[in-house]
């Protein structure tokens, strides 16, 4: 009831009397509303904020509130009069209410049903709720309630259903929860609840549903849980619960779902779990469980989904699983399972998904698996399986995804494969398969990826593949395929990649190749193609990489190739091309790699080559180029990997402009006719690791830099006029050559020595001359690192930098006590990370990768490839937001490759966000971390030469130093963009929750995949939620965000509760702006996502608009990290 204040004069008595009458009337009507109605009005007026006026008929003129919106009443006692009606139900769900719940809620003592779900209510849950002792159902979910759960709920002895999920509640689950003896449903997931689960849960013997996932619970699951004999659903995923799974779970025989993924469980899976014969879903993935899979699981006759992946389970797959007749999905991937695949799995007639990849399985693939008529997805990759592909697979009518790569399979691929199966992904690469490509593999017109690389397949590409209109990528590298280039491929309008390298294709490249309009990758290296390049190649406007090296192609380069404006990599090396280079090559402004070596090109190098400012590697060795080296080559400011002009007919002086190439690491000018001095500007080549000037006519003194002074004589052979360094002294008075007078005849003995020595020298000289003549007639590979397409990618010449930090293996072993587990600070995708304090006191991080150096099996090089990937990537990078690599080495004692990194004292962003420390980071700190990571990633995408895709951006791969500055690390999957010699990562590139949606159907990783992953990291920083979400909420954070914005619009309720405690609108608006940037990064279509450079600009602009408010206090509020 409102209060009115009036001013009136004494003579206005009549007006005063009228007003007094109205006030009296209002008081009378308010007092006529019963007590429940008055409590409800207090809820509305002193708590709720009803912006949409949903509670418009709540007013005090009614006798009872029983007709109000959301209110239901029941009679109390035998009377049906209005005085006997009490409020028993209050349903205000989805009313768009905000504000708080007033303590007056405790006055509704007859309330049985309370539903305030799906609003924007904040504040604490009032402790007065305990007065509603008749409550049976209380739904407070999907609001923004904070604070702790009031202990007064123990008074609600009649409560059957209690739902507080999707709020911002903190603190423990109170021990008093055990007093709710009638409780059947307890739903508390997606909050910030902490501490151990209370033992009093064992008192809830009527409990059927307990869901408390996505909180910060720790400790063990109490053994008392075994007393909840009516429990049907146990969901505790995405917490920090540790210890062993209690065997008492096996007593809960009514359980239907056990959802415990992504915790810190260790130890064995208890055998007692086999007692759960009603269980339908068992999800234990993403933990640290060890030991064998219990055979007793085979007793769980109702099981439909069995997820044990991403653990450390070992032993064999129990054959008893064959008794699980209702199972539809089994995923045991990413474990340490060994032995053979049991044939008993073929008895699971309902099986639709079987993932066993990345284990240590051996033996053959049982042909009995062909009986699984419902099988749609089978992935047995990255194991040691042998024998043939079961012929029965060609009869699986539901098969869509068949991945068997990286095994040792042999025999012929079943020729009927695809005839009856709607295949969309087939990857058999890196095996020892033979025979022909199955002719019907695309019979159902669904195939998007066919990868048969690195096998022994022969014959032609069958017409069935050439007519496969759905095909996006055809990868048959490293086989024995024959025939001419299949012109029919260019009728496939969706085809983006043709990779036919290292086969036996022959004949000319047909002009029809120009009709492959969407082609981005055309790799034809190491075949027997001949004739000229067709002019029609110029029509491939989307072409990014073009590799025809190691063929027998002739003729000139068509000038029309300049129309391929998107070209980044052009490799024409090791052919028989002739003529001069077309000046139009200089208009390919995106070009990063140009390889023309070992051909018969002649004439001058066109000065327009200097326009290729993105070029990182220039290979022109072994040709007939003549004239002078154009000074415009000094404009190639991005040139980094190599400039190779060796074995040509260049003359004149070396242009001093070459000294402007500050990033250049290898320079080869040997075997030409160059004269004059080595320019003094070469002292500016600070990145140079090696160069070769041999067999020219150079004179004068070597540059005074250390690299020139320490070079061996072989780099300068055949240049009589050079001096300095290890050559002769430039001072004639200090000549190192003996004076002729000293060789005059002396004693007879001395004469004989001279004769013998002279004879030996003469013989050696003749031998050297013969060797030089041989190499002049047969030019060798230039000294700069240039990887042959047929050679393995794993070469010594691939190491582009020299270790500078003086750390020895002995220091590392002593600092880690021989790599003892107590020094482990993390486990990455490709290795284990140890903390090591060096004798100097410097703390470093040591990543240890098990090596496979002793084996020659092509399938055993994954870790070495990972080692090289990190070295090749990190060794060339210097950026404040990229983890610095100090050095690398190989430790023979443990057969391990070691990478020595800068140590990050605060660990990973993932640990800070999801390890119970997120409350320690305010928004300015999180924003600074986001901007730093973005700048590091933008450097990889736009400033590295060549550009780099990270492939595994996630919060655990963003490391934080003591000043809360972000450093992007873990380059185990890093890939130079469009570098065909890079290891083909056929397995999933990335981590669950961060993988861009297009990867599922293209199997292609682009910069836009990194941007999607970064968007997920932004969402983690903003929401505090993990990247993987419950399936009913979308399954991942990006989908959850889209759904939340769709259902509730973009408001601050989407943000981490720890962030919304601030009351500054500028900061809140800034967080909403960054959320919009995150949503933009996670757009479903790659073309809709910004570039990383654009992301950085958007973040900077958003911070500038927020102004000085975005200043972190975290660094001063938090104690420094513990000393090493």
Curated annotation (Swiss-Prot):
Its EC number is 2.7.11.1. It is an enzyme of class 2 (transferase). It is found in: Membrane. Residues 1-32 form the signal peptide. LRR repeats lie at residues 86-109, 110-132, 134-156, 158-180, 182-205, 206-228, 230-252, 254-277, 278-300, 302-325, 326-348, 350-371, 374-397, 398-420, 422-444, 446-468, 470-491, 494-516, 518-540, 542-564, 566-588, 590-613, 614-636, 638-661, 663-686, 687-709. Residues 33-752 are extracellular. The modification Phosphoserine is found at residue 986. Coiled coil: none annotated. The chain crosses the membrane at residues 753-773. The keyword Transcription does not apply. Residues 774-1124 are cytoplasmic. Belongs to the protein kinase superfamily. Ser/Thr protein kinase family. This is Probable leucine-rich repeat receptor-like protein kinase At2g33170. It comes from Arabidopsis thaliana (Mouse-ear cress).
């Amino acid at each position: 009831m409102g209060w009115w204040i009036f001013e009136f004069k004494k003579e206005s008595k009549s007006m005063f009397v009228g007003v007094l009458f109205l006030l009296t009337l209002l008081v009378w009507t308010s007092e006529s509303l019963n007590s429940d109605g008055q409590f409800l009005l207090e809820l509305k007026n002193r708590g709720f904020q009803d912006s949409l006026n949903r509670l418009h008929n709540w007013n005090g003129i009614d006798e009872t509130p029983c007709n109000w919106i959301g209110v239901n009443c029941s009679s109390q006692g035998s009377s049906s009069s209005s005085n006997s009606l009490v409020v028993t139900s209050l349903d205000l769900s989805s009313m768009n209410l905000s504000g708080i719940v007033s303590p007056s809620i405790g006055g509704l003592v007859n309330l049985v049903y309370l539903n305030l779900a799906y609003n924007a209510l904040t504040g604490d849950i009032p402790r007065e709720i305990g007065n509603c002792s008749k409550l049976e159902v209380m739904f407070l979910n999907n609001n923004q309630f904070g604070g702790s759960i009031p202990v007064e709920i123990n008074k609600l002895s009649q409560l059957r259903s209690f739902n507080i999920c999707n709020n911002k509640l903190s603190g423990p689950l109170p021990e008093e929860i055990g007093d709710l003896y009638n409780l059947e449903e307890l739903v508390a997931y997606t909050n910030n609840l902490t501490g151990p689960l209370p033992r009093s849960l064992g008192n809830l013997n009527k409990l059927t549903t307990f869901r408390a996932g996505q909180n910060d619970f720790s400790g063990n699951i109490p053994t008392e849980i075994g007393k909840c004999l009516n429990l049907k659903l146990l969901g505790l995923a995405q917490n920090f619960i540790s210890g062993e799974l209690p065997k008492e779970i096996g007593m809960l025989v009514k359980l239907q779902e056990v959802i415990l993924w992504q915790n810190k469980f260790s130890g064995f899976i208890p055998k007692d779990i086999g007692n759960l014969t009603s269980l339908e879903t068992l999800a234990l993935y993403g933990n640290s469980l060890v030991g064998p899979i219990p055979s007793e699981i085979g007793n769980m006759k109702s099981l439909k989904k069995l997820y044990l992946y991403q653990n450390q389970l070992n032993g064999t797959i129990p054959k008893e699983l064959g008794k699980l007749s209702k199972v539809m999905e089994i995923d045991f991937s990413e474990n340490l399972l060994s032995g053979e695949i049991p044939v008993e799995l073929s008895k699971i007639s309902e099986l639709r998904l079987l993932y066993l990849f990345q284990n240590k399985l051996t033996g053959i693939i049982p042909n009995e698996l062909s009986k699984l008529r419902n099988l749609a997805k089978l992935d047995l990759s990255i194991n040691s399986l042998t024998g043939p592909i079961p012929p029965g697979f060609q009869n699986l009518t539901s098969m869509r995804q068949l991945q068997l790569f990286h095994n040792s399979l042999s025999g012929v691929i079943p020729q009927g494969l695809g005839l009856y199966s709607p295949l969309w992904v087939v990857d058999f690469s890196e095996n020892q398969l033979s025979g022909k490509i199955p002719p019907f593999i695309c019979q159902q017109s669904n195939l998007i990826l066919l990868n048969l690389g690195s096998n022994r397949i022969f014959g032609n590409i069958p017409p069935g593949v050439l007519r496969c209109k759905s095909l996006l990528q055809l990868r048959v590298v490293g086989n024995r395929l024959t025939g001419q280039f299949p012109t029919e491929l260019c009728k496939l309008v969706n085809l983006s990649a043709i990779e036919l390298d290292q086969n036996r294709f022959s004949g000319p490249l047909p002009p029809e190749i120009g009709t492959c309009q969407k082609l981005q990758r055309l790799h034809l290296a190491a075949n027997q193609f001949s004739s000229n390049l067709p002019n029609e190649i110029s029509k491939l406007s989307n072409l990014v990489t073009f590799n025809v090296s190691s063929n027998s192609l002739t003729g000139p380069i068509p000038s029309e190739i300049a129309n391929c404006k998107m070209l980044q990599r052009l490799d024409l090396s090791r052919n028989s091309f002739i003529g001069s280079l077309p000046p139009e090559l200089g208009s390919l402004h995106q070009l990063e790699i140009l390889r023309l070596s070992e051909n018969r090109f002649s004439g001058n190098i066109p000065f327009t080559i200097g326009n290729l400012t993105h070029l990182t590697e220039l290979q022109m060795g072994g040709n007939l180029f003549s004239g002078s080296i154009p000074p415009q080559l000094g404009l190639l400011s991005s040139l980094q990997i190599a400039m190779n002009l060796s074995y040509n007919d260049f003359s004149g002086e070396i242009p001093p402009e070459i000294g402007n190439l500050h990033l250049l690491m290898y320079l080869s000018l040997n075997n030409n006719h160059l004269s004059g001095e080595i320019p003094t500007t070469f002292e500016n080549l600070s990145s140079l690791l090696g160069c070769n000037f041999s067999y020219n006519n150079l004179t004068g003194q070597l540059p005074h830099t250390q690299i020139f002074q320490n070079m061996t004589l072989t780099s300068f052979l055949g240049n009589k006029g050079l001096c300095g360094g290890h050559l002769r002294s430039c001072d004639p008075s200090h000549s190192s050559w003996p004076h002729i007078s000293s060789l005059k005849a002396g004693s007879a003995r001395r004469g004989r020595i001279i004769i013998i020595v002279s004879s030996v020298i003469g013989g050696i000289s003749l031998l050297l001359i013969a060797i030089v003549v041989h190499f002049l007639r047969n030019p060798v590979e230039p000294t700069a690192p240039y990887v042959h397409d047929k050679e393995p990618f794993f070469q010594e010449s691939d190491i582009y930098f020299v270790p500078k930090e003086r750390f020895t293996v002995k220091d590392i072993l002593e600092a880690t006590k021989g790599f003892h587990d107590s020094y482990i600070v993390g486990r990455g995708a490709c290795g284990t990370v140890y903390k090591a304090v060096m004798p100097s006191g410097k703390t470093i991080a040591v990543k240890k990768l098990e090596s496979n150096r002793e084996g020659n099996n092509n399938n055993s090089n994954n870790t070495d490839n990972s080692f090289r990937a990190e070295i090749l990537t990190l060794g060339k990078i210097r950026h404040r937001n990229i983890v610095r690599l100090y050095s690398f080495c190989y430790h023979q004692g443990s057969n391990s490759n070691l990478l020595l990194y800068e140590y990050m004292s605060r660990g990973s962003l993932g640990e800070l966000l999801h390890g119970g420390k997120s409350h320690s980071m305010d928004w300015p700190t999180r924003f600074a971390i986001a901007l730093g990571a973005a700048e590091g990633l933008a450097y990889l995408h736009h400033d590295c030469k060549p550009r780099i895709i990270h492939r595994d951006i996630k919060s655990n791969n963003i490391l934080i130093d003591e000043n809360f500055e972000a450093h992007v690390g873990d380059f185990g999957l890093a890939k130079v963009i469009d570098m065909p010699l890079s290891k083909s990562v056929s397995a999933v590139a990335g981590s669950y929750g961060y993988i861009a949606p297009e990867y599922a159907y293209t199997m292609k990783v682009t910069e836009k995949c990194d941007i999607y992953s970064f968007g997920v990291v932004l969402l983690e920083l903003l929401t505090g939620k993990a990247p993987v979400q419950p399936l009913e909420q979308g399954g991942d954070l990006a989908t959850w965000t889209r759904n939340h914005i769709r259902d509730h619009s973009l408001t601050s309720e989407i943000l981490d509760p720890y962030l919304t405690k601030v009351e500054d609108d500028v900061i809140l608006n800034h967080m909403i702006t960054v959320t919009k940037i995150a949503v933009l990064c996670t757009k479903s279509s790659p073309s809709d996502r910004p570039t990383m450079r654009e992301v950085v600009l958007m973040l900077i602009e958003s911070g500038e608009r927020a102004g000085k408010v975005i200043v972190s206090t975290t660094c001063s509020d938090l104690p420094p990290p513990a000393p090493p």
